[in-house]
């Protein structure tokens, strides 16, 4: 070998390499890398190393990379000399094995203890542990021996005197050393001539593509080939996730994931402080870049990462469609094809547009839920969308008996079965035929024979049938058998179970041998579906068992034919019972009562040609979901024909009817009949159907091509266009892995064998179909697809306009209600501030067409209040005074004010000294002496509708949870049946779920995958549709003069056939700007207040909002008669809505609120995202602001900026951007600074991700304060109500063990820390309130079989009686059954409880354990001992 020759003569011959010899060679198989170690008495320079590389590359061209390391060749050296003079050589050698430790080893303390022992001390515990893990002592000892021939022992010791160094400190130290080296290297580089200096500093500065470090010239390696030995390498790829970590010293570490689609890896970067913000800005998701860095083991991540030195932004060269005339894709799936399509509609449309395609179709499986996204993408990328669907076609026009005419049940029938070598009538052979002849209801003849297939029978067929080769080797061949079998049949009706399969073999063989065959055919599968609909499956053995017919030796033709004959005879008896006496009557009755849910489905492509077609498709989608859903939304052929106008029907893929019929080798006449339903036929790349080869359905690729050719010719012969499509399920070939993972997760055994269902260019498709001939391929790929695209109108699946419902006279009614209510409060002459506000609001509301929304909300609230349930408003509707005057909300947006309920005297506080009327001191009317009412929370109307009144209003209302269904039903009364639909939602795979799919896949495949690649795979699987649902309270309203199909199809949530709820097919967000959406939400607070009112007789509306005792609860529990120490809580807000959580309780402790307006601010702060933590909390703590002046609700921003003299419209725009988490533009930041807005305020705005409206916060606090009032003054009613409505995690067992058990359980849950579950959290809340209740002297009473309610906690003289459902293991339904049964009389035994009360054995045991069944005998039977 050449390598051996080099080693034999290991001194290089070139003069420039004189004295250099090869010391050792290492080959790394995984990365195909050669490492050459040379020795020389002189120092080997870079030019010589380059020459050595050339020598090896010349001789060994097949290595991907050759690395050369040089050592000094010295003799007569000892260990001390090595440590003092040649340590750097050792360090450089160690880098071969441990690439990241250079500077650390240089800075270590070295001491030679005796002649052959080296003691090495190092003070960085982080790196020390890594080096120990790497077996550093052995590597160092071996390296010294290899390089210098000196044997020694190494003792590596942690020097604790230097203190410990954590990971981040170590990284900062490393980064400082790197910077130092870069500076050092740059000084050296200045001496090199410019033309040889690839990293010249001036060139670097000019290169704007450099993000960090220097330019990178070497070729990148595949990320999949990187391992711990890789050292310093270059990679190239797409950044897909970033994370910024801030150290204690304020330095920032940039961590990001990068992929080249061979794998992915984590990259870490420590930018210079001056460059940090720029680097963070440039390293974003989607960046395509080249990186050079060192591969190191990260002990925190427990895997290798790259410590980046250089990062260069690159222009990505992407695949383009360069054909002069481009194709159009007419079969494409998005993420809305449930668990099947991998890419978003936008990404697919963006690619098609980028390639210059004039149009692209969207054809998801059975749904059209990608349309809204596609519509927006079409506008964005200026491309036509062809809206379509791949439906599930049911051919409901196929009779049970074909060509049977008026044949009677007494006629002659031949029931037969065949066994074959496989599934293909073209490639497989018959090996057995069995038949029985039936006439006048009796078996009159039999036929049975083996058939020699002239080939070996496959093993799986032998296993299935028991027919071996020796059994058929002497049997007659099919050409001998078939004429005899045809003679046996005569003109009988041919019968089989799944006749399509068996008859196809007979037809094919008759055709091959020129035998005429045209007998009537009856299939017993649809016959049994018609007669026995109660069955779920209709396999022969299942039907036989159901009818009590024996089936011996299943999968033998003779036995199967006999059993099928018996089934036919039983079916004939049942048909006669139905007075069906002939096959024509049978077909007629079958078509009348056909259950298409049990019929086979075919794929079909339906494209929308125009607006009429769009509406028809929406109707078709709706009916398929509402009336014909069984596993899939099925579309009967008759239904498609009913809505066919404006639609174009295509034959779809290999699962389509046309492909299947061609595969079955049907006659031309039969095929002509089948294709008459379609407008165009479809062919696809043969590799899409490779599974058919694997499964033995077709023989090879050539047969797949033949099928496509037949479909093409069939279309041409019938003057029908044929198109070539990709059947796109993912964007690029690399994306197939996501589909593999999801399919594997669903249990598909063939998930690994992914067909290439990616989007192809025109040239790729032309090459794919070149076997058709150049002209035909061009026609199918380009001409016909473009013609179809051109024949389709540009349409919008959702109209742009808004279509609010119309109520005659709504404008006048709203105005009248408003003014009348205002006069009733403020008097005949309205205060100017009220009059101006109402006039402005009414004009804005009426002029923009929103009066009807107000009127509807008023009617819904009025209905609830009349029925005794308060309604809480949500969102910013509390900003609208008109909403207050029309009784939609209790929140009054006027400035704080007094008003006399008698003489209407009023006084408004407009100087900003008070934020809420509730905080005003009590005051008597100066005119009539009565106590003045206090109101007003100072909320600008513009928060709701904007300064132009053009912001879409959103009125959210909190109804009692137990009353919500009544209100939903009432909307139908208001708008009419068929005009009200629940707001639909689409449930997609969340990242957490996707992560589970990925981890399962990796585990099952036993793959070793880095975290970055797991993250990439997780992101790729996220967002794929899984199911559908409904908004908890959203109702979409269609105007009387319109219909839902102009906006969306409709369906049931989660395709649940058992529910009466109908939802929009589109996610409600897609159409909420077009149709009115009412938010009729269920909430506990109104339910709680109703129950408290029922128990106490106190009207919640009359409760003062600033009662001193009540307000004190938010800073101390003293008003409850307990102290903070015994309660283990510094405030008294356990169980109060919005203020009972641990997080908000701590906020109360931190802020010490003393007013209603303080509570409003706390509510706003606690509900926002990044509003309190690391924001207002910090600025208050550091003294920049106070609770009263920080940013708490969205309204604060606009109000404050207007006070700072910013133009109102700009103030509103800034508020809207900030509240949605969009930060501030440079222009907005500049104008804020110009108006002296403080820096902390600007920074606070930039941190906010989401903000609560003040109107919402006020409404919540009003409810909380009212409930708190009952907690203080009516404690028993409060606790009974709380546990009845909110305590789903009540633990009766712990509660009745006593106070000590409760406190122990509280401590146990608190000790769980981050491991606490949601159930634990719920239980903790319940136990804390139980503890508080005990401290207040109120106790629980055990459940009683006759005294307890099913689900409500009842007040008794001695305490609160728990309900039956509060006992563990006794659910609410079981409790209700018992309560209903006891109304009929007491239970006489456990047996009676079981029968009348429907109590299961488990329920009875749990009731007994709780002590509810004392004295109740086991049985109804009396004995002497019972007397």
From Swiss-Prot:
Protein's UniProt name: DNA polymerase III PolC-type
Domain of life: Bacteria
UniProt keyword annotations, A-Z: Cytoplasm, DNA replication, DNA-directed DNA polymerase, Exonuclease, Hydrolase, Nuclease, Nucleotidyltransferase, Transferase
Reaction(s) catalysed by this chain's protein: DNA(n) + a 2'-deoxyribonucleoside 5'-triphosphate = DNA(n+1) + diphosphate
GO molecular function: 3'-5' exonuclease activity; DNA binding; DNA-directed DNA polymerase activity
Organism: Clostridium tetani (strain Massachusetts / E88)
Start and end residues of each Exonuclease domain: 413-568
Taxonomic path: Bacteria, Bacillati, Bacillota, Clostridia, Eubacteriales
PANTHER family from the UniProt entry: DNA POLYMERASE III POLC-TYPE, DNA POLYMERASE III SUBUNIT ALPHA
Family note: Belongs to the DNA polymerase type-C family. PolC subfamily.
GO annotation (BP), single: DNA-templated DNA replication
EC number: 2.7.7.7
Function noted in UniProt: Required for replicative DNA synthesis. This DNA polymerase also exhibits 3' to 5' exonuclease activity.
């Amino acid at each position: 070998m050449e390598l051996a020759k080099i080693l034999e003569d290991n001194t290089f011959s070139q003069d420039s390499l004189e004295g250099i010899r090869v010391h050792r060679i290492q080959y790394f198989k995984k990365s195909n890398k050669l490492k050459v170690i040379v020795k020389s008495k002189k120092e080997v320079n870079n030019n010589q190393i380059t020459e050595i590389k050339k020598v090896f590359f010349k001789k060994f061209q097949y290595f991907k990379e050759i690395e050369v390391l040089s050592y000094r060749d010295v003799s007569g050296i000892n260990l001390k000399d090595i440590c003092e003079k040649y340590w750097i050589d050792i360090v450089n050698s160690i880098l071969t094995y441990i690439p990241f430790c250079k500077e650390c080893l240089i800075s270590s303390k070295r001491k030679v203890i005796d002649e052959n022992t080296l003691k090495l001390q190092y003070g960085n515990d982080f790196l020390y542990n890594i080096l120990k893990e790497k077996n550093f002592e052995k590597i160092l000892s071996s390296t010294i021996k290899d390089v210098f021939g000196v044997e020694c022992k190494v003792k590596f010791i942690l020097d604790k005197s230097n203190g410990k160094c954590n990971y981040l400190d170590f990284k900062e130290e490393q980064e400082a050393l790197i910077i130092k080296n870069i500076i050092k290297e740059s000084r050296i580089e200045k001496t090199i001539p410019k033309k040889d200096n690839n990293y010249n500093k001036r060139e670097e500065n000019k290169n704007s593509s450099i993000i960090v470090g220097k330019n990178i010239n070497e070729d990148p390696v595949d990320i999949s080939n990187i391992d711990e030995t890789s050292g310093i390498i270059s990679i190239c790829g797409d950044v897909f996730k970033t994370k910024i970590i801030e150290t204690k010293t304020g330095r920032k570490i940039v961590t990001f994931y990068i992929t080249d689609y061979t794998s992915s890896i984590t990259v870490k970067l420590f930018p210079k402080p001056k460059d940090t913000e720029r680097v963070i800005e440039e390293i974003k998701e989607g960046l395509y870049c080249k990186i050079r860095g060192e591969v190191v083991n990260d002990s925190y991540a427990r895997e290798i990462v790259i410590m980046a030195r250089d990062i260069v932004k690159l222009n990505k060269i992407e695949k383009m469609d360069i054909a002069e005339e481009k194709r159009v894709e007419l079969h494409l799936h998005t993420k809305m094809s449930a668990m099947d399509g991998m890419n978003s509609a936008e990404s697919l449309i963006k690619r098609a547009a980028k390639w210059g395609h004039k149009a692209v179709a969207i054809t998801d499986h059975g749904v059209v839920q990608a349309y809204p996204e596609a519509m927006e993408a079409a506008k964005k990328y200026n491309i036509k969308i062809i809206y379509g669907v791949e439906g599930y076609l049911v051919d409901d026009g196929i009779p049970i008996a074909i060509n049977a005419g008026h044949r009677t049940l007494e006629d002659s029938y031949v029931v037969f079965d065949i066994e074959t070598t496989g599934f293909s009538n073209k490639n497989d052979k018959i090996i057995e035929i069995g038949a029985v002849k039936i006439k006048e209801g009796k078996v009159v003849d039999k036929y049975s024979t083996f058939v020699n297939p002239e080939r070996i029978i496959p093993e799986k067929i032998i296993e299935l049938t028991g027919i071996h080769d020796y059994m058929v080797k002497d049997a007659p061949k099919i050409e001998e058998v078939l004429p005899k079998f045809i003679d046996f049949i005569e003109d009988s009706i041919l019968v089989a179970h799944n006749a399509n399969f068996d008859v196809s073999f007979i037809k094919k063989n008759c055709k091959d041998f020129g035998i005429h065959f045209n007998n009537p055919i009856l299939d017993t599968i649809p016959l049994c579906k018609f007669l026995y609909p109660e069955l779920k499956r209709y396999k022969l053995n299942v039907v036989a068992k159901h009818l009590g017919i024996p089936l011996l030796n299943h999968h033998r033709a003779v036995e199967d034919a006999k059993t099928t004959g018996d089934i036919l005879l039983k079916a004939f008896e049942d048909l006669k019972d139905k007075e069906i006496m002939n096959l024509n009557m049978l077909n007629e009755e079958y078509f009348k009562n056909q259950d298409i849910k049990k019929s086979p489905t075919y794929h079909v492509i339906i494209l929308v040609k125009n607006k009429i077609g769009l509406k028809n498709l929406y109707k078709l989608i709706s009916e398929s979901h509402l009336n014909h859903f069984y596993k899939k939304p099925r579309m009967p052929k008759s239904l498609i024909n009913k809505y066919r106008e404006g639609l174009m029907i295509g034959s779809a893929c290999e699962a389509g009817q046309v492909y299947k019929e061609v595969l079955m080798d049907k006659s031309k006449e039969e095929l002509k009949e089948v294709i008459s339903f379609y407008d165009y036929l479809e062919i696809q790349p043969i590799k899409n159907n490779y599974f058919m080869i694997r499964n033995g359905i077709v023989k090879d690729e050539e047969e797949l091509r033949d099928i496509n050719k037949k479909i093409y010719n069939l279309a041409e012969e019938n003057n029908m266009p044929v198109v070539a499509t990709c059947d796109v399920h993912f964007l690029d070939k690399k994306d197939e892995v996501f589909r593999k993972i999801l399919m594997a997760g669903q249990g598909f055994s063939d998930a690994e064998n992914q067909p290439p269902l990616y989007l192809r260019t025109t040239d790729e498709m032309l090459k794919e179909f070149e076997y058709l001939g150049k002209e035909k391929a061009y026609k199918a790929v380009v001409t016909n697809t473009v013609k179809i695209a051109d024949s389709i109108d540009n349409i919008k699946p959702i109209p742009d306009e808004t279509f609010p419902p119309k109520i005659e006279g709504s404008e006048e009614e709203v105005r009248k209600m408003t003014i009348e209510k205002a006069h009733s409060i403020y008097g005949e002459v309205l205060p100017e501030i009220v009059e101006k506000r109402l006039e402005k609001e009414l004009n804005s509301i009426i002029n923009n067409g929103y009066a009807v929304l107000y009127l509807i909300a008023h009617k819904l609230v009025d209905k609830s209040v009349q029925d005794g349930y308060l309604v809480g408003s949500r969102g910013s509707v509390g900003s609208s005074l008109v909403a207050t005057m029309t009784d939609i909300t209790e929140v009054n947006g006027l400035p704080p004010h007094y008003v006399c309920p008698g003489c209407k005297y009023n006084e408004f506080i407009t100087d900003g000294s008070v934020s809420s009327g509730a905080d005003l001191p009590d005051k008597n009317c100066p005119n009539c002496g009565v106590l003045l009412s206090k109101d007003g929370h100072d909320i600008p109307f513009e928060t709701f509708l904007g300064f132009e009144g053009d912001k879409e209003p959103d009125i959210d209302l909190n109804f009692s949870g137990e009353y919500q269904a009544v209100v939903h039903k009432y909307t139908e009364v208001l708008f009419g049946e068929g005009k009200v639909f629940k707001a639909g939602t689409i449930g997609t795979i969340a990242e957490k779920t996707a992560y589970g799919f990925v981890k399962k896949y990796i585990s099952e495949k036993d793959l070793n995958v880095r975290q970055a690649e797991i993250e990439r795979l997780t992101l790729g699987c996220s967002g794929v549709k899984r199911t559908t649902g409904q908004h908890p309270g959203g109702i979409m309203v269609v105007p009387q003069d319109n219909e839902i199909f102009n906006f969306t199809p409709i369906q049931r949530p989660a395709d649940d056939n058992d529910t009466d709820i109908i939802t929009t097919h589109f996610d409600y967000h897609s159409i909420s700007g077009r149709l009115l959406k009412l938010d009729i939400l269920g909430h506990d607070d109104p339910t709680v207040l109703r129950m408290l009112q029922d128990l106490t007789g106190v009207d919640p509306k009359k409760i003062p909002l600033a009662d001193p005792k009540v307000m004190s609860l938010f800073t101390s529990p003293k008003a409850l008669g307990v102290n903070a120490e015994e309660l283990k809580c510094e405030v008294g807000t356990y169980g109060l809505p919005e203020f009972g959580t641990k997080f908000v309780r701590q906020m109360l402790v931190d802020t010490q609120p003393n007013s209603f307006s303080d509570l409003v601010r706390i509510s706003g702060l606690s509900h926002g995202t990044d509003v309190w933590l690391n924001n207002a909390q910090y600025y208050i703590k550091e003294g920049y602001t106070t609770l009263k002046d920080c940013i708490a609700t969205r309204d604060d921003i606009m109000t404050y900026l207007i006070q700072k003299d910013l133009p109102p419209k700009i103030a509103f725009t800034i508020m809207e951007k900030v509240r949605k988490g969009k930060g501030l533009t440079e222009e907005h930041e500049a104008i804020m600074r110009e108006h002296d807005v403080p820096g902390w305020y600007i920074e606070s705005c930039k941190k906010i991700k989401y903000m609560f409206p003040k109107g919402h916060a006020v409404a919540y606090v009003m409810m909380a304060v009212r409930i708190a009032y009952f907690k203080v003054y009516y404690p028993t009613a409060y606790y009974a109500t709380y546990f009845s409505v909110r305590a789903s995690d009540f633990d009766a067992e712990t509660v009745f063990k006593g106070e000590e058990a409760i406190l122990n359980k509280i401590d146990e849950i608190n000790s769980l820390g981050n491991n606490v579950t949601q159930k634990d959290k719920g239980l903790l809340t319940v136990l804390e309130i139980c503890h508080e209740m005990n401290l207040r002297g109120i106790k629980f009473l055990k459940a009683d079989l006759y005294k307890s309610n099913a689900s409500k906690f009842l007040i008794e003289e001695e305490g609160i009686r728990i309900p039956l459902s509060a006992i563990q293991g006794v659910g609410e339904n079981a409790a209700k059954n018992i309560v209903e049964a006891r109304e009929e009389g007491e239970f006489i035994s456990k047996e009676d409880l079981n029968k009348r009360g429907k109590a299961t054995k488990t329920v009875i045991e749990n009731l007994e354990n709780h002590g509810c069944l004392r004295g109740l005998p086991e049985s109804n039977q009396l004995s002497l001992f019972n007397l």
